Swiss-Prot record:
Residues annotated as the enzyme's active site: 205, 337
Full protein name: Enolase
Root EC class: lyase
Organism: Rhizorhabdus wittichii (strain DSM 6014 / CCUG 31198 / JCM 15750 / NBRC 105917 / EY 4224 / RW1) (Sphingomonas wittichii)
InterPro entries cross-referenced by the UniProt entry: Enolase, Enolase-like_C_sf, Enolase-like_N, Enolase_C, Enolase_CS, Enolase_N
Top-level taxon in the UniProt lineage: Bacteria
GO biological process, one term: glycolytic process
Keyword RNA-binding: no
Gene (name only): eno
Catalytic activity annotation: (2R)-2-phosphoglycerate = phosphoenolpyruvate + H2O
Pathway annotation from the record: Carbohydrate degradation; glycolysis; pyruvate from D-glyceraldehyde 3-phosphate: step 4/5
Lineage: Bacteria, Pseudomonadati, Pseudomonadota, Alphaproteobacteria, Sphingomonadales
Length: 427
């Protein structure tokens, strides 16, 4: 009954106005699944390959027609007739069909679109929501949002070197109340920036990109806004950073262009430790460059016992890189981006590996998103307890928050908001 009978892909437009891949899957019983693929701005060197056409005369070279054709031809031929419920077999077939270690032949964007739409179709065939189909009866934990309200780095045109400054409403009783707190703080911050004559236009992920000189300047604005909105920093709301340090790691040092300062890996670790001591920062993502294993070890040894250290570029949701990082004692948390690895099965494998090793996992969007809300369901399915899906602006970000609100309502009394327990340092 769940045999795949039709596969169709198309080019659609993502939140940055660039083409991306959308895939429709139809099953023998009429069940239907659709998934759209996200795209990153700051990408790790070890991510699975997102295939772009490169034809400068169309979409400025960013078209994905080749990936769409791969789905409609090779991938369709390979998976039509297979059972959608056999997710791991289908994903293994897609990996084998591509035949490269980084999914570079067919494109991770082609493969992921097929993989996720298969899961959605199978869930519909079972008459189950996606989170329940993937996660089973134990899927009931609503994640704490990491809300990106000030942007710098590759996500902004300002001097701030760090890429994201986030709030986490850990003290809220429910996911809905966490979203409300985030919204109130977001609007309070907007007024504070406006009153100081700073820009309040929003970036790719819905956060502000004011012309501030340094990370402490951004953190001070956020702290004041939390308090003005009626919340207590460190209790109701804590802070998180995404340094995206790979972007400014040059010749063995961290070049803070905005501050005019260069820091060695040891000095970088000291700087981050100092920020975490001065502010209620409980999570730091990509605090070191993706290849600076020595720096990661220094940072983990220094503050890993009290701060969540999230590997994004370091691990790229890749079970092999994660296994090596666990073995070497690098970081203590995995950022999960489905398009970094390219199939649902490998994504779930990485999350399971992290959780077995005592690492936390954070489900994440990309800077180029669509209305697709799959990651909201996956956050609940895996009980990972944390999600990064942008600020409280832009419908491509709010689609995920709104889906989480619906899931919380649907779960009713069995819903559990992760709160402070999501981060071991706060437990």
């Amino acid at each position: 009954m769940t045999a795949i009978v039709d596969v169709h892909a198309r080019q659609i437009i993502d939140s940055r106005g660039n083409p991306t891949v959308e895939v429709d899957i139809t099953l023998e019983d009429g069940s239907f699944g659709r998934a759209a693929v996200p795209s990153g701005a700051s990408t790790g060197a070890y991510e699975a390959v997102e295939k772009r056409d490169g034809d400068k005369s169309r979409w400025l070279g960013k078209g994905v027609q080749d990936a769409v054709d791969a789905v409609n031809d090779e991938i369709a031929d390979a998976i039509i007739g297979m059972e959608a419920e056999d997710q791991s077999e289908i994903d293994a077939r897609l990996i084998e069909l591509d035949g490269t270690p980084n999914k570079g032949r067919l494109g991770a964007n082609a493969i992921l679109g097929a993989s996720l739409s298969v899961a959605r179709a199978a869930a519909e065939a079972r008459a189950l929501p996606l989170y329940r189909y993937v996660g089973g009866v134990s899927a009931q934990v609503l994640p704490v949002p990491m809300m990106n309200i000030i942007n710098g780095g590759a996500h902004a045109d300002n001097p701030i070197d760090f890429q994201e400054f986030m709030i986490m409403p850990v003290g809220a009783p429910t996911l809905f109340d966490a979203v409300r707190a985030g919204s109130e703080i977001f609007h309070t911050l907007k007024k504070a920036l406006h009153d100081k004559g700073l820009a309040t236009a929003v970036g790719d992920e819905g956060g502000f990109a004011p012309n501030l000189a340094s990370a402490p300047d951004a953190l001070d604005f956020i702290m004041q806004s939390i308090e003005k909105a009626g919340y207590k920093p460190g209790d109701d709301v804590v802070l998180a950073l995404d340094c995206a340090a790979t972007e400014f790691f040059k010749d063995g040092v961290y070049d803070f262009h905005g501050e005019g300062v260069k820091r060695s890996p040891a000095e970088m670790a000291d700087y981050l430790a100092d920020l975490c001591a001065r502010y209620p920062i409980v999570s730091v993502e990509d605090g070191m460059g993706e290849d600076d294993f020595e720096g990661w070890k220094i940072l983990t040894d220094k503050i890993g016992h009290k701060v969540q250290l999230v590997g994004d570029d370091l691990f790229v949701t890749n079970p092999k890189r994660l296994a090596q990082g666990i073995k070497d004692g690098l970081a203590n948390s995995l950022l999960v981006k489905v398009n970094q690895i390219g199939t649902l099965s490998e994504t779930l494998e990485a999350v399971n590996m992290a959780q077995r090793a005592g690492y936390t996992a954070v489900m994440s969007h990309r800077s180029g998103e669509t209305e697709d809300s799959t990651i909201a369901d996956l956050a609940v399915a895996t009980n990972c307890g944390q999600i990064k899906t942008g600020s409280l602006a832009r419908s491509d970000r709010l689609a995920k928050y709104n889906q989480l609100i619906r899931i919380e309502e649907e779960l009713g009394p069995v819903a559990v908001y992760a709160g402070r327990s999501a981060i071991k340092a706060l437990g």
